[in-house]
Amino acid sequence: SRDWSSDVCSSDLDRLLMVISWNLPQGHDLDRYFGYIVKAPLRQNNFFGLKRRKRLENEPKVPVISKLQEQTLWYKTKPEFFSGNKATWPGMLYTALIPCDSYYLLLGWNAKNKYSQFKCIEVLWYDSKQEPNFGKNVFKIPKKNPKRLVFEYSKEAQMSLRFDPGQNRIIYSHLGPVDENPAMTGQFAFYGPDGSFDALNEHDNRWILEEAIDVRNKRNKNDYAPKPNHTEEIQLYPRNK
């Protein structure tokens, strides 16, 4: 049997929000997900001891704790277009929190079943009543208008999904079927990374897809320094004449 996992996400850039999530195996290779969101007030010191800007309209004066109730099997039908709230939460285990203007991005993972799993870029935003909602159109993807991005792949594979704060973009493995047979398209139990990477770049508070990026480290001036000539003799001590 598998052990349960948990994670706590907060952002060093914002420090106004903390998300706690965990999963419990339920048998038959299915997991249940549980979570809380703790939203700190803006004007007072929050739980990180950081003072923020003037309070917004309807902004609570004390930290608000929202219990998340999973919408079971929410991913069965068009998961990228599902809209949720704290009572119909698209459950997953969150691993990173990215603050944006008027919303947050969450990087998450869901075990799904014994054949496939998925990672997700979720959108968390608050309405006028300061209630949390999940899913929003902040992505600019050709021929799509998703409320979140879902990457499903084989249970045997490993996918990279991370935020690069230096370049303010999300980098992730490009997935594809292990076999080029067209019949494998959409059979996600046979999907895995193909060795290339894509990225989402933030522009005007939206995230724009950039395909086939170069993930190699950029060279700096020290990389072009002349290399030592190892054929030359280095005399540490003068020879006796």
PLM regions with names:
Residues L93-C100, K112, N133-E202, E211:
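Short aromatic loop motif centered on NTY/YTY
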Residues E211-K241:
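Gram-negative outer-membrane assembly/targeting C-terminal domains
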Residues P25-D31, N85-A87, A111-S116, G186-Y191:
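Short consensus segments that form the blades of beta-propeller domains
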Residues Y33-Q44, C120-Q130, T185-D204:
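Beta-propeller blade signature
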Residues G91-S128:
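Hydrophobic, aromatic-enriched interface-forming segments
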Residues K39-C100:
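Short N-terminal edge-element motif at the start of the domain
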